Protein backbone atom coordinates (compact mmCIF):
# COMPACT_ATOMS: atom_id res chain seq x y z
CA UNK A 1 0.00 0.00 0.00
CA UNK A 2 1.32 3.45 -0.94
CA UNK A 3 1.64 4.75 2.64
CA UNK A 4 3.84 7.72 1.76
CA UNK A 5 1.52 9.25 -0.82
CA UNK A 6 0.92 13.00 -0.56
CA UNK A 7 -2.17 14.95 -1.54
CA UNK A 8 -0.40 16.34 -4.62
CA UNK A 9 0.63 12.82 -5.64
CA UNK A 10 -2.89 11.43 -5.18
CA UNK A 11 -4.35 14.17 -7.38
CA UNK A 12 -1.81 13.64 -10.16
CA UNK A 13 -1.97 9.81 -10.01
CA UNK A 14 -5.77 9.88 -10.26
CA UNK A 15 -5.90 12.33 -13.16
CA UNK A 16 -3.06 10.60 -15.05
CA UNK A 17 -4.72 7.20 -14.57
CA UNK A 18 -8.03 8.30 -16.04
CA UNK A 19 -6.36 10.22 -18.85
CA UNK A 20 -4.67 6.92 -19.75
CA UNK A 21 -8.18 5.45 -20.00
CA UNK A 22 -9.28 8.01 -22.58
CA UNK A 23 -10.69 10.64 -20.21
CA UNK A 24 -10.23 14.38 -20.74
CA UNK A 25 -9.20 16.44 -17.72
CA UNK A 26 -11.60 19.34 -17.16
CA UNK A 27 -11.10 22.25 -14.78
CA UNK A 28 -12.72 22.24 -11.36
CA UNK A 29 -15.46 24.87 -11.12
CA UNK A 30 -16.27 27.63 -8.66
CA UNK A 31 -17.49 26.86 -5.14
CA UNK A 32 -20.48 29.11 -5.91
CA UNK A 33 -22.88 27.26 -8.25
CA UNK A 34 -24.01 29.10 -11.35
CA UNK A 35 -27.76 29.43 -11.93
CA UNK A 36 -28.75 26.98 -9.19
CA UNK A 37 -30.82 28.39 -6.31
CA UNK A 38 -31.27 24.95 -4.72
CA UNK A 39 -27.83 24.91 -3.06
CA UNK A 40 -25.49 27.56 -1.66
CA UNK A 41 -22.22 25.85 -2.60
CA UNK A 42 -20.86 23.21 -4.94
CA UNK A 43 -21.34 20.08 -2.83
CA UNK A 44 -19.84 17.37 -5.04
CA UNK A 45 -17.79 16.91 -8.18
CA UNK A 46 -20.91 16.06 -10.16
CA UNK A 47 -22.69 19.32 -9.28
CA UNK A 48 -21.29 21.43 -12.16
CA UNK A 49 -21.93 18.52 -14.54
CA UNK A 50 -25.66 18.10 -13.89
CA UNK A 51 -26.71 19.60 -17.27
CA UNK A 52 -24.47 17.10 -19.05
CA UNK A 53 -25.69 14.18 -16.97
CA UNK A 54 -29.20 15.33 -17.95
CA UNK A 55 -28.34 15.06 -21.66
CA UNK A 56 -26.51 18.22 -22.74
CA UNK A 57 -23.44 17.31 -24.86
CA UNK A 58 -20.16 18.26 -23.12
CA UNK A 59 -17.62 20.11 -25.29
CA UNK A 60 -14.77 17.94 -23.96
CA UNK A 61 -16.46 14.64 -24.86
CA UNK A 62 -18.03 11.68 -23.06
CA UNK A 63 -15.16 10.67 -20.72
CA UNK A 64 -14.17 13.31 -18.17
CA UNK A 65 -12.07 13.60 -15.01
CA UNK A 66 -11.29 16.44 -12.59
CA UNK A 67 -10.47 17.73 -9.10
CA UNK A 68 -13.35 19.72 -7.59
CA UNK A 69 -13.50 22.01 -4.53
CA UNK A 70 -16.57 21.26 -2.42
CA UNK A 71 -18.32 22.72 0.64
CA UNK A 72 -21.03 20.89 2.57
CA UNK A 73 -22.82 23.13 5.02
CA UNK A 74 -24.84 20.35 6.64
CA UNK A 75 -21.66 19.22 8.39
CA UNK A 76 -20.90 22.48 10.24
CA UNK A 77 -22.27 21.32 13.58
CA UNK A 78 -20.44 17.98 13.27
CA UNK A 79 -17.05 19.59 12.68
CA UNK A 80 -14.86 19.24 15.73
CA UNK A 81 -14.72 15.45 15.72
CA UNK A 82 -11.89 13.63 13.98
CA UNK A 83 -13.57 13.08 10.62
CA UNK A 84 -15.97 15.83 9.51
CA UNK A 85 -14.95 18.67 7.18
CA UNK A 86 -16.88 21.54 5.64
CA UNK A 87 -14.41 22.04 2.77
CA UNK A 88 -12.91 19.09 0.94
CA UNK A 89 -11.54 18.10 -2.45
CA UNK A 90 -13.29 15.54 -4.63
CA UNK A 91 -11.63 13.50 -7.37
CA UNK A 92 -14.09 12.42 -10.03
CA UNK A 93 -14.49 10.63 -13.33
CA UNK A 94 -17.57 10.51 -15.55
CA UNK A 95 -19.00 8.57 -18.43
CA UNK A 96 -21.67 10.53 -20.31
CA UNK A 97 -23.41 7.79 -22.26
CA UNK A 98 -20.08 6.02 -22.87
CA UNK A 99 -18.94 3.09 -20.67
CA UNK A 100 -21.01 1.73 -17.79
CA UNK A 101 -20.70 -0.61 -14.79
CA UNK A 102 -18.16 -3.11 -16.10
CA UNK A 103 -15.55 -0.55 -17.10
CA UNK A 104 -16.24 1.81 -14.19
CA UNK A 105 -15.79 -0.87 -11.55
CA UNK A 106 -12.72 -2.28 -13.33
CA UNK A 107 -11.11 1.18 -13.44
CA UNK A 108 -11.77 1.72 -9.73
CA UNK A 109 -10.39 -1.70 -8.84
CA UNK A 110 -7.23 -1.19 -10.90
CA UNK A 111 -6.50 2.26 -9.46
CA UNK A 112 -7.04 1.08 -5.89
CA UNK A 113 -5.12 -2.21 -6.02
CA UNK A 114 -2.39 -1.86 -8.67
CA UNK A 115 1.04 -1.14 -7.14
CA UNK A 116 1.61 1.56 -9.78
CA UNK A 117 -1.21 3.56 -8.21
CA UNK A 118 -2.49 3.06 -4.64
CA UNK A 119 -1.56 -0.59 -4.11
CA UNK A 120 -4.21 -1.34 -1.48
CA UNK A 121 -4.43 -5.09 -0.67
CA UNK A 122 -7.81 -6.57 -1.62
CA UNK A 123 -8.28 -7.93 1.89
CA UNK A 124 -8.34 -4.33 3.21
CA UNK A 125 -11.24 -3.37 0.94
CA UNK A 126 -14.98 -4.00 1.20
CA UNK A 127 -17.75 -3.14 -1.25
CA UNK A 128 -21.45 -2.31 -0.97
CA UNK A 129 -24.13 -2.61 -3.67
CA UNK A 130 -27.86 -1.90 -3.91
CA UNK A 131 -30.04 -4.66 -2.39
CA UNK A 132 -33.07 -3.80 -4.54
CA UNK A 133 -36.63 -2.77 -3.71
CA UNK A 134 -40.01 -2.33 -5.39
CA UNK A 135 -38.59 0.44 -7.62
CA UNK A 136 -35.49 -1.27 -8.99
CA UNK A 137 -33.99 -4.79 -8.87
CA UNK A 138 -31.08 -6.01 -6.76
CA UNK A 139 -27.80 -4.95 -8.37
CA UNK A 140 -26.41 -8.42 -9.00
CA UNK A 141 -24.51 -7.07 -12.01
CA UNK A 142 -22.19 -4.87 -9.91
CA UNK A 143 -21.64 -7.65 -7.37
CA UNK A 144 -20.75 -10.10 -10.17
CA UNK A 145 -18.26 -7.64 -11.66
CA UNK A 146 -16.51 -7.24 -8.29
CA UNK A 147 -16.36 -11.05 -7.96
CA UNK A 148 -14.91 -11.40 -11.47
CA UNK A 149 -12.06 -9.12 -10.39
CA UNK A 150 -11.14 -11.40 -7.48
CA UNK A 151 -13.25 -9.98 -4.65
CA UNK A 152 -14.64 -12.69 -2.37
CA UNK A 153 -18.40 -12.78 -1.71
CA UNK A 154 -17.91 -12.12 2.01
CA UNK A 155 -16.51 -8.66 1.15
CA UNK A 156 -19.57 -7.63 -0.87
CA UNK A 157 -22.54 -6.28 1.09
CA UNK A 158 -26.04 -5.62 -0.26
CA UNK A 159 -27.48 -2.51 1.42
CA UNK A 160 -30.83 -0.66 1.14
CA UNK A 161 -31.70 2.37 -0.96
CA UNK A 162 -30.74 4.91 1.70
CA UNK A 163 -27.17 3.58 1.55
CA UNK A 164 -26.66 2.65 -2.10
CA UNK A 165 -28.74 4.90 -4.33
CA UNK A 166 -28.23 8.39 -5.75
CA UNK A 167 -30.79 10.91 -6.92
CA UNK A 168 -32.65 12.38 -8.50
CA UNK A 169 -31.44 15.92 -7.83
CA UNK A 170 -35.05 17.19 -7.84
CA UNK A 171 -38.45 15.51 -7.71
CA UNK A 172 -37.80 13.88 -11.07
CA UNK A 173 -34.75 13.10 -13.19
CA UNK A 174 -31.83 10.69 -13.65
CA UNK A 175 -30.93 8.44 -10.73
CA UNK A 176 -29.69 4.97 -9.98
CA UNK A 177 -27.87 2.52 -7.72
CA UNK A 178 -24.30 2.99 -6.61
CA UNK A 179 -21.49 0.81 -5.38
CA UNK A 180 -19.32 2.17 -2.58
CA UNK A 181 -15.77 1.18 -1.68
CA UNK A 182 -14.60 1.05 1.94
CA UNK A 183 -11.18 0.56 3.51
CA UNK A 184 -10.77 -1.36 6.76
CA UNK A 185 -9.03 0.83 9.35
CA UNK A 186 -8.05 -2.17 11.46
CA UNK A 187 -10.20 -1.06 14.39
CA UNK A 188 -12.08 -3.85 16.23
CA UNK A 189 -15.57 -4.72 15.00
CA UNK A 190 -18.44 -3.06 16.87
CA UNK A 191 -20.36 -6.35 17.03
CA UNK A 192 -21.41 -9.41 15.09
CA UNK A 193 -23.27 -7.26 12.54
CA UNK A 194 -20.37 -4.85 11.97
CA UNK A 195 -20.21 -3.98 8.26
CA UNK A 196 -19.43 -1.09 5.91
CA UNK A 197 -21.85 1.75 6.53
CA UNK A 198 -22.47 0.99 10.20
CA UNK A 199 -20.63 4.20 11.22
CA UNK A 200 -18.60 2.63 14.02
CA UNK A 201 -15.36 3.80 12.40
CA UNK A 202 -13.96 0.42 11.41
CA UNK A 203 -14.85 0.91 7.74
CA UNK A 204 -14.30 4.25 5.98
CA UNK A 205 -15.80 4.98 2.56
CA UNK A 206 -13.23 6.30 0.08
CA UNK A 207 -14.95 6.01 -3.32
CA UNK A 208 -18.46 5.90 -4.74
CA UNK A 209 -19.53 4.86 -8.25
CA UNK A 210 -23.04 6.04 -9.18
CA UNK A 211 -24.79 4.35 -12.08
CA UNK A 212 -27.49 6.60 -13.53
CA UNK A 213 -29.66 4.10 -15.34
CA UNK A 214 -33.19 5.18 -14.36
CA UNK A 215 -35.43 8.22 -14.67
CA UNK A 216 -37.81 8.97 -11.81
CA UNK A 217 -41.16 10.11 -13.19
CA UNK A 218 -43.72 12.54 -11.74
CA UNK A 219 -45.93 9.64 -10.61
CA UNK A 220 -43.05 8.17 -8.59
CA UNK A 221 -42.34 5.34 -11.01
CA UNK A 222 -38.94 4.62 -12.55
CA UNK A 223 -38.15 4.15 -16.25
CA UNK A 224 -34.88 2.84 -17.76
CA UNK A 225 -32.69 5.55 -19.29
CA UNK A 226 -31.62 5.22 -22.92
CA UNK A 227 -28.42 7.18 -22.18
CA UNK A 228 -26.75 5.74 -19.09
CA UNK A 229 -24.10 7.71 -17.21
CA UNK A 230 -21.47 7.04 -14.55
CA UNK A 231 -20.52 9.56 -11.84
CA UNK A 232 -17.80 8.68 -9.35
CA UNK A 233 -16.25 10.58 -6.46
CA UNK A 234 -13.25 10.03 -4.17
CA UNK A 235 -12.55 12.29 -1.19
CA UNK A 236 -8.92 13.45 -1.27
CA UNK A 237 -8.30 14.16 2.42
CA UNK A 238 -10.02 11.01 3.68
CA UNK A 239 -8.24 8.74 1.18
CA UNK A 240 -4.81 10.17 2.01
CA UNK A 241 -5.48 9.73 5.74
CA UNK A 242 -6.41 6.07 5.22
CA UNK A 243 -3.39 5.34 3.00
CA UNK A 244 -0.98 7.03 5.40
CA UNK A 245 -2.48 5.16 8.34
CA UNK A 246 -3.35 8.42 10.11
CA UNK A 247 -6.06 8.37 12.80
CA UNK A 248 -7.77 11.41 11.26
CA UNK A 249 -7.77 13.78 8.29
CA UNK A 250 -6.47 16.39 10.75
CA UNK A 251 -3.22 14.42 11.05
CA UNK A 252 -2.45 14.74 7.32
CA UNK A 253 -0.53 17.51 5.56
CA UNK A 254 -3.87 19.13 4.69
CA UNK A 255 -3.98 20.37 8.30
CA UNK A 256 -0.62 19.95 10.05
CA UNK A 257 0.73 23.45 9.26
CA UNK A 258 -2.65 25.05 10.05
CA UNK A 259 -2.86 23.27 13.40
CA UNK A 260 0.78 24.17 14.15
CA UNK A 261 -0.07 27.85 13.62
CA UNK A 262 -2.99 27.56 16.07
CA UNK A 263 -0.74 25.83 18.63
CA UNK A 264 1.79 28.66 18.31
CA UNK A 265 -0.68 31.48 18.98
CA UNK A 266 -2.69 29.68 21.67
CA UNK A 267 0.05 27.84 23.53
CA UNK A 268 -2.22 24.78 23.50
CA UNK A 269 -0.79 21.50 22.21
CA UNK A 270 -2.91 19.45 19.83
CA UNK A 271 -3.40 15.90 21.07
CA UNK A 272 -3.20 16.67 24.79
CA UNK A 273 -6.89 17.13 25.58
CA UNK A 274 -10.01 16.18 23.61
CA UNK A 275 -11.86 19.36 24.59
CA UNK A 276 -9.13 21.68 23.30
CA UNK A 277 -8.52 19.36 20.33
CA UNK A 278 -12.14 19.92 19.32
CA UNK A 279 -11.67 23.70 19.34
CA UNK A 280 -8.42 23.44 17.36
CA UNK A 281 -10.09 21.25 14.73
CA UNK A 282 -13.04 23.66 14.44
CA UNK A 283 -10.71 26.64 13.93
CA UNK A 284 -8.56 24.75 11.40
CA UNK A 285 -11.52 23.53 9.36
CA UNK A 286 -13.55 26.74 9.44
CA UNK A 287 -10.63 29.05 8.59
CA UNK A 288 -9.62 26.71 5.75
CA UNK A 289 -13.16 26.77 4.36
CA UNK A 290 -13.47 30.54 4.79
CA UNK A 291 -10.22 31.08 2.86
CA UNK A 292 -11.45 28.99 -0.07
CA UNK A 293 -14.84 30.76 -0.16
CA UNK A 294 -13.27 34.24 0.04
CA UNK A 295 -10.55 33.28 -2.44
CA UNK A 296 -12.94 31.80 -4.99
CA UNK A 297 -13.18 33.63 -8.35
CA UNK A 298 -16.85 34.33 -7.50
CA UNK A 299 -16.00 35.89 -4.14
CA UNK A 300 -18.71 35.68 -1.49
CA UNK A 301 -18.45 38.10 1.44
CA UNK A 302 -19.85 37.65 4.97
CA UNK A 303 -23.51 38.70 5.20
CA UNK A 304 -26.81 37.76 6.83
CA UNK A 305 -28.22 35.75 3.93
CA UNK A 306 -27.39 32.69 1.86
CA UNK A 307 -23.79 31.69 1.29
CA UNK A 308 -22.62 34.90 2.99
CA UNK A 309 -24.37 33.84 6.19
CA UNK A 310 -22.69 30.44 6.13
CA UNK A 311 -19.33 32.18 5.70
CA UNK A 312 -20.11 34.56 8.57
CA UNK A 313 -21.12 31.63 10.77
CA UNK A 314 -17.88 29.75 10.01
CA UNK A 315 -15.71 32.77 10.81
CA UNK A 316 -17.58 33.60 14.01
CA UNK A 317 -17.54 30.02 15.25
CA UNK A 318 -13.76 29.93 14.69
CA UNK A 319 -13.36 33.20 16.64
CA UNK A 320 -15.37 31.87 19.56
CA UNK A 321 -13.34 28.68 19.77
CA UNK A 322 -10.18 30.79 19.66
CA UNK A 323 -11.41 32.55 22.79
CA UNK A 324 -12.06 29.15 24.37
CA UNK A 325 -8.38 28.35 23.79
CA UNK A 326 -7.43 31.59 25.55
CA UNK A 327 -6.61 33.61 22.43
CA UNK A 328 -7.38 37.31 22.88
CA UNK A 329 -7.95 39.72 20.02
CA UNK A 330 -7.56 39.11 16.30
CA UNK A 331 -5.82 35.89 15.31
CA UNK A 332 -7.48 34.42 12.20
CA UNK A 333 -4.84 35.86 9.86
CA UNK A 334 -2.30 33.42 11.32
CA UNK A 335 -4.03 30.12 10.44
CA UNK A 336 -5.36 31.77 7.25
CA UNK A 337 -1.81 32.50 6.11
CA UNK A 338 -0.97 28.85 6.77
CA UNK A 339 -3.95 27.76 4.65
CA UNK A 340 -2.83 29.96 1.77
CA UNK A 341 0.80 28.82 1.96
CA UNK A 342 -0.27 25.17 2.10
CA UNK A 343 -2.65 25.30 -0.88
CA UNK A 344 -1.58 28.14 -3.18
CA UNK A 345 0.59 25.86 -5.31
CA UNK A 346 -2.45 24.01 -6.67
CA UNK A 347 -5.12 26.64 -6.00
CA UNK A 348 -3.40 29.77 -7.28
CA UNK A 349 -6.50 31.91 -6.63
CA UNK A 350 -5.68 31.81 -2.90
CA UNK A 351 -2.41 33.67 -3.40
CA UNK A 352 -3.96 36.01 -5.95
CA UNK A 353 -6.70 36.96 -3.47
CA UNK A 354 -4.58 36.83 -0.29
CA UNK A 355 -5.07 40.51 0.58
CA UNK A 356 -8.84 40.29 0.19
CA UNK A 357 -9.00 37.07 2.25
CA UNK A 358 -7.01 38.51 5.16
CA UNK A 359 -8.79 41.89 5.04
CA UNK A 360 -12.28 40.37 5.10
CA UNK A 361 -11.37 37.92 7.87
CA UNK A 362 -10.09 40.75 10.05
CA UNK A 363 -13.13 42.94 9.36
CA UNK A 364 -15.54 40.15 10.28
CA UNK A 365 -13.43 39.22 13.30
CA UNK A 366 -13.54 42.82 14.57
CA UNK A 367 -17.32 42.96 14.21
CA UNK A 368 -17.85 39.67 15.96
CA UNK A 369 -15.51 40.26 18.87
CA UNK A 370 -17.68 43.24 19.82
CA UNK A 371 -20.88 41.24 19.26
CA UNK A 372 -19.49 38.33 21.26
CA UNK A 373 -18.56 40.54 24.17
CA UNK A 374 -22.07 42.00 24.45
CA UNK A 375 -23.95 38.79 23.69
CA UNK A 376 -22.01 36.57 26.08
CA UNK A 377 -22.36 39.15 28.85
CA UNK A 378 -26.13 39.21 28.32
CA UNK A 379 -26.26 35.40 28.25
CA UNK A 380 -24.34 35.22 31.52
CA UNK A 381 -26.91 37.57 33.08
CA UNK A 382 -29.72 35.27 31.95
CA UNK A 383 -27.99 32.03 32.99
CA UNK A 384 -28.70 31.91 36.77
CA UNK A 385 -32.46 32.16 36.25
CA UNK A 386 -32.36 29.76 33.32
CA UNK A 387 -30.60 27.11 35.41
CA UNK A 388 -33.38 27.32 38.00
CA UNK A 389 -35.87 26.15 35.36
CA UNK A 390 -36.36 22.39 35.92
CA UNK A 391 -36.98 21.87 32.18
CA UNK A 392 -33.58 23.40 31.35
CA UNK A 393 -35.07 25.11 28.27
CA UNK A 394 -34.24 28.62 27.07
CA UNK A 395 -37.42 30.26 25.69
CA UNK A 396 -37.19 31.05 22.01
CA UNK A 397 -38.10 34.70 22.64
CA UNK A 398 -35.00 35.10 24.85
CA UNK A 399 -32.79 33.55 22.19
CA UNK A 400 -34.36 35.87 19.63
CA UNK A 401 -33.64 38.88 21.84
CA UNK A 402 -29.95 37.95 21.77
CA UNK A 403 -30.14 37.74 17.99
CA UNK A 404 -32.23 40.87 17.41
CA UNK A 405 -30.59 43.16 19.97
CA UNK A 406 -26.98 41.97 19.90
CA UNK A 407 -26.67 40.21 16.53
CA UNK A 408 -25.86 37.01 18.42
CA UNK A 409 -26.32 33.98 16.08
CA UNK A 410 -28.83 31.37 17.24
CA UNK A 411 -26.23 28.65 16.62
CA UNK A 412 -23.91 30.21 19.21
CA UNK A 413 -26.77 30.57 21.69
CA UNK A 414 -27.43 26.86 21.21
CA UNK A 415 -23.74 26.06 21.76
CA UNK A 416 -23.59 28.14 24.96
CA UNK A 417 -26.81 26.52 26.13
CA UNK A 418 -25.47 23.03 25.48
CA UNK A 419 -22.31 23.77 27.45
CA UNK A 420 -24.51 24.68 30.45
CA UNK A 421 -26.79 21.65 30.08
CA UNK A 422 -29.60 23.67 28.50
CA UNK A 423 -31.52 23.53 25.23
CA UNK A 424 -33.17 26.28 23.19
CA UNK A 425 -36.83 26.22 22.17
CA UNK A 426 -35.91 26.43 18.49
CA UNK A 427 -39.52 26.25 17.30
CA UNK A 428 -40.39 29.36 19.31
CA UNK A 429 -37.25 31.12 18.06
CA UNK A 430 -38.09 30.28 14.43
CA UNK A 431 -41.60 31.64 14.91
CA UNK A 432 -40.26 34.93 16.30
CA UNK A 433 -37.70 35.11 13.50
CA UNK A 434 -40.39 34.53 10.86
CA UNK A 435 -42.52 37.37 12.26
CA UNK A 436 -39.44 39.59 12.21
CA UNK A 437 -38.86 38.77 8.53
CA UNK A 438 -42.47 39.49 7.61
CA UNK A 439 -42.30 42.90 9.28
CA UNK A 440 -39.02 43.65 7.51
CA UNK A 441 -40.51 42.79 4.14
CA UNK A 442 -43.70 44.85 4.56
CA UNK A 443 -43.76 47.60 1.95
CA UNK A 444 -40.42 46.54 0.47
CA UNK A 445 -39.59 44.98 -2.88
CA UNK A 446 -41.47 42.09 -4.43
CA UNK A 447 -40.44 38.83 -2.79
CA UNK A 448 -39.02 36.52 -5.41
CA UNK A 449 -39.89 32.92 -4.77
CA UNK A 450 -37.22 30.23 -5.00
CA UNK A 451 -37.35 27.35 -7.42
CA UNK A 452 -35.58 24.29 -8.64
CA UNK A 453 -32.65 24.76 -11.01
CA UNK A 454 -34.11 22.73 -13.82
CA UNK A 455 -34.31 22.97 -17.57
CA UNK A 456 -37.95 24.04 -17.68
CA UNK A 457 -39.03 26.41 -20.45
CA UNK A 458 -39.17 29.42 -18.12
CA UNK A 459 -35.78 28.77 -16.51
CA UNK A 460 -34.26 28.36 -19.97
CA UNK A 461 -35.89 31.62 -21.07
CA UNK A 462 -34.35 33.50 -18.12
CA UNK A 463 -30.96 32.01 -18.97
CA UNK A 464 -31.16 33.49 -22.46
CA UNK A 465 -32.40 36.81 -21.05
CA UNK A 466 -29.31 36.90 -18.82
CA UNK A 467 -27.09 36.88 -21.93
CA UNK A 468 -29.07 39.76 -23.42
CA UNK A 469 -28.80 41.70 -20.15
CA UNK A 470 -25.04 41.13 -19.93
CA UNK A 471 -24.50 42.51 -23.43
CA UNK A 472 -26.86 45.46 -22.90
CA UNK A 473 -25.07 46.45 -19.68
CA UNK A 474 -21.73 46.55 -21.51
CA UNK A 475 -23.28 48.65 -24.29
CA UNK A 476 -24.73 51.17 -21.82
CA UNK A 477 -22.14 51.24 -19.00
CA UNK A 478 -18.94 50.21 -20.78
CA UNK A 479 -16.67 47.23 -21.38
CA UNK A 480 -15.54 47.22 -17.75
CA UNK A 481 -18.78 45.37 -16.95
CA UNK A 482 -18.03 41.72 -16.16
CA UNK A 483 -20.45 39.07 -14.97
CA UNK A 484 -19.75 38.27 -11.31
CA UNK A 485 -22.45 35.66 -10.85
CA UNK A 486 -26.08 34.90 -11.54
CA UNK A 487 -28.98 33.04 -10.01
CA UNK A 488 -31.91 31.89 -12.11
CA UNK A 489 -35.25 30.39 -11.12
CA UNK A 490 -38.48 29.87 -13.05
CA UNK A 491 -39.78 33.21 -11.68
CA UNK A 492 -36.88 35.66 -12.10
CA UNK A 493 -33.21 36.25 -12.80
CA UNK A 494 -30.57 37.80 -10.57
CA UNK A 495 -27.40 39.12 -12.19
CA UNK A 496 -24.26 40.44 -10.45
CA UNK A 497 -21.83 42.58 -12.44
CA UNK A 498 -18.81 44.81 -11.90
CA UNK A 499 -19.67 48.52 -11.80
CA UNK A 500 -18.47 51.14 -9.29
CA UNK A 501 -21.71 53.08 -8.73
CA UNK A 502 -25.51 52.81 -8.78
CA UNK A 503 -27.12 52.92 -12.22
CA UNK A 504 -29.18 55.98 -13.07
CA UNK A 505 -32.83 55.65 -14.04
CA UNK A 506 -31.89 56.61 -17.60
CA UNK A 507 -29.27 53.85 -17.75
CA UNK A 508 -31.73 51.25 -16.48
CA UNK A 509 -34.34 52.33 -19.04
CA UNK A 510 -31.78 52.13 -21.85
CA UNK A 511 -30.72 48.61 -20.79
CA UNK A 512 -34.37 47.53 -20.75
CA UNK A 513 -34.90 49.08 -24.20
CA UNK A 514 -31.92 47.26 -25.73
CA UNK A 515 -32.94 43.90 -24.28
CA UNK A 516 -36.55 44.29 -25.40
CA UNK A 517 -35.46 45.34 -28.91
CA UNK A 518 -33.41 42.14 -29.15
CA UNK A 519 -36.42 40.14 -27.97
CA UNK A 520 -38.76 41.87 -30.43
CA UNK A 521 -36.32 41.15 -33.29
CA UNK A 522 -36.88 37.41 -32.67
CA UNK A 523 -33.15 36.71 -33.05
CA UNK A 524 -32.00 33.10 -33.62
CA UNK A 525 -29.97 31.46 -30.83
CA UNK A 526 -27.26 29.17 -32.17
CA UNK A 527 -24.55 27.08 -30.52
CA UNK A 528 -21.11 26.17 -31.83
CA UNK A 529 -18.35 24.10 -30.20
CA UNK A 530 -14.90 25.61 -30.74
CA UNK A 531 -11.43 25.92 -29.14
CA UNK A 532 -11.34 28.44 -26.29
CA UNK A 533 -8.69 30.52 -28.06
CA UNK A 534 -10.91 30.81 -31.13
CA UNK A 535 -13.84 31.87 -28.91
CA UNK A 536 -11.68 34.64 -27.45
CA UNK A 537 -10.63 35.78 -30.93
CA UNK A 538 -14.24 36.22 -32.06
CA UNK A 539 -14.95 38.28 -28.93
CA UNK A 540 -17.08 35.79 -27.01
CA UNK A 541 -17.82 37.05 -23.49
CA UNK A 542 -16.92 34.71 -20.63
CA UNK A 543 -17.42 34.63 -16.88
CA UNK A 544 -14.66 36.63 -15.20
CA UNK A 545 -12.29 34.41 -13.22
CA UNK A 546 -13.88 31.17 -14.41
CA UNK A 547 -11.71 28.28 -15.62
CA UNK A 548 -12.72 26.87 -18.99
CA UNK A 549 -11.82 23.75 -20.94
CA UNK A 550 -9.72 23.91 -24.11
CA UNK A 551 -12.90 23.32 -26.13
CA UNK A 552 -16.07 25.25 -25.20
CA UNK A 553 -19.66 25.89 -26.27
CA UNK A 554 -20.31 29.35 -27.69
CA UNK A 555 -23.89 30.64 -27.89
CA UNK A 556 -24.67 33.41 -30.38
CA UNK A 557 -27.88 35.45 -30.20
CA UNK A 558 -28.09 36.89 -33.71
CA UNK A 559 -25.44 39.60 -34.01
CA UNK A 560 -26.33 40.91 -30.55
CA UNK A 561 -24.47 38.60 -28.15
CA UNK A 562 -21.71 35.99 -28.28
CA UNK A 563 -20.91 34.22 -25.03
CA UNK A 564 -19.16 31.09 -23.72
CA UNK A 565 -21.83 29.06 -21.93
CA UNK A 566 -22.96 25.51 -21.18
CA UNK A 567 -26.62 26.20 -22.08
CA UNK A 568 -29.49 25.52 -22.38
CA UNK A 569 -31.18 28.37 -24.27
CA UNK A 570 -34.35 29.10 -26.22
CA UNK A 571 -34.27 28.76 -30.01
CA UNK A 572 -35.35 32.35 -30.73
CA UNK A 573 -35.60 35.46 -28.55
CA UNK A 574 -39.16 36.24 -29.61
CA UNK A 575 -40.51 33.70 -27.12
CA UNK A 576 -39.08 35.49 -24.07
CA UNK A 577 -41.74 38.10 -23.36
CA UNK A 578 -41.15 41.63 -22.06
CA UNK A 579 -37.97 42.18 -20.01
CA UNK A 580 -38.37 44.35 -16.91
CA UNK A 581 -35.76 45.38 -14.29
CA UNK A 582 -37.34 45.22 -10.83
CA UNK A 583 -34.41 46.30 -8.69
CA UNK A 584 -30.80 47.45 -9.01
CA UNK A 585 -28.68 47.55 -5.88
CA UNK A 586 -25.23 46.97 -4.39
CA UNK A 587 -24.14 43.36 -3.97
CA UNK A 588 -20.67 44.04 -2.55
CA UNK A 589 -17.86 46.54 -3.03
CA UNK A 590 -17.62 47.33 -6.74
CA UNK A 591 -20.36 44.86 -7.64
CA UNK A 592 -23.98 45.74 -8.52
CA UNK A 593 -26.97 43.37 -8.62
CA UNK A 594 -30.01 43.42 -10.91
CA UNK A 595 -33.22 41.48 -10.34
CA UNK A 596 -35.41 41.21 -13.41
CA UNK A 597 -38.47 39.37 -14.71
CA UNK A 598 -39.97 38.37 -18.04
CA UNK A 599 -43.60 39.41 -18.38
CA UNK A 600 -46.05 37.82 -20.83
Swiss-Prot record:
Name the Enzyme Commission number(s) assigned to this protein: 6.1.1.7
Cofactor(s) listed: Zn(2+)
Report the cofactor remark.
Answer: Binds 1 zinc ion per subunit.
Where is the protein found, in the record's own terms? Cytoplasm
Question: Which Gene Ontology terms cover its molecular function?
Answer: alanine-tRNA ligase activity; aminoacyl-tRNA deacylase activity; ATP binding; tRNA binding; zinc ion binding
Catalytic reaction equation(s): tRNA(Ala) + L-alanine + ATP = L-alanyl-tRNA(Ala) + AMP + diphosphate
Task: Kindly list the biological process annotations in GO that this record carries.
Answer: alanyl-tRNA aminoacylation
Q: Name one GO cellular component term.
A: cytosol
Keywords of the record: Aminoacyl-tRNA synthetase, ATP-binding, Cytoplasm, Ligase, Metal-binding, Nucleotide-binding, Protein biosynthesis, RNA-binding, tRNA-binding, Zinc
Functional description taken from the UniProt entry? Catalyzes the attachment of alanine to tRNA(Ala) in a two-step reaction: alanine is first activated by ATP to form Ala-AMP and then transferred to the acceptor end of tRNA(Ala). Also edits incorrectly charged Ser-tRNA(Ala) and Gly-tRNA(Ala) via its editing domain.
Note on domains (UniProt): Consists of two domains; the N-terminal catalytic domain (in this organism this is shorter than usual) and the editing domain; the C-terminal C-Ala domain found in most orthologs is missing. The editing domain removes incorrectly charged amino acids.
Q: What family, per the record?
A: Belongs to the class-II aminoacyl-tRNA synthetase family.
Q: Which NCBIfam families match?
A: alaS (TIGR00344), PRK01584.1 (NF002436)
Name it. Alanine--tRNA ligase
Source organism of the structure: Treponema denticola (strain ATCC 35405 / DSM 14222 / CIP 103919 / JCM 8153 / KCTC 15104)
Source gene?
alaS
Amino acid sequence: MNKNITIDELRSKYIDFFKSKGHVEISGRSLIPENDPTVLFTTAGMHPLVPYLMGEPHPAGTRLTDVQKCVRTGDIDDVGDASHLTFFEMLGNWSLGDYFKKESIAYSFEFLTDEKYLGIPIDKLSFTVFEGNEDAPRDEESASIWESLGVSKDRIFFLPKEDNWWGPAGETGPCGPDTEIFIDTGKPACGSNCRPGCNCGKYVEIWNNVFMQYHKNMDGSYSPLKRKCVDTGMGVERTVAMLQGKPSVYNTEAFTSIIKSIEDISGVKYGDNEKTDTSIRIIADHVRTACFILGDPKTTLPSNIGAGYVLRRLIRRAVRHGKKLGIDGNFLSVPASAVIAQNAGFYTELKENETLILTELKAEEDKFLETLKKGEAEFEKMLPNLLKNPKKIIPGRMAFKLYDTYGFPIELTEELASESGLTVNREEFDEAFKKHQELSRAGSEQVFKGGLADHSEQTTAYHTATHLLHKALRMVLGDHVQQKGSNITAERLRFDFSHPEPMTEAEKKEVERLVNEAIKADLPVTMEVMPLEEAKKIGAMALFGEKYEDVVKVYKIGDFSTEVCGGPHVERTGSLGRFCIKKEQSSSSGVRRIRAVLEH
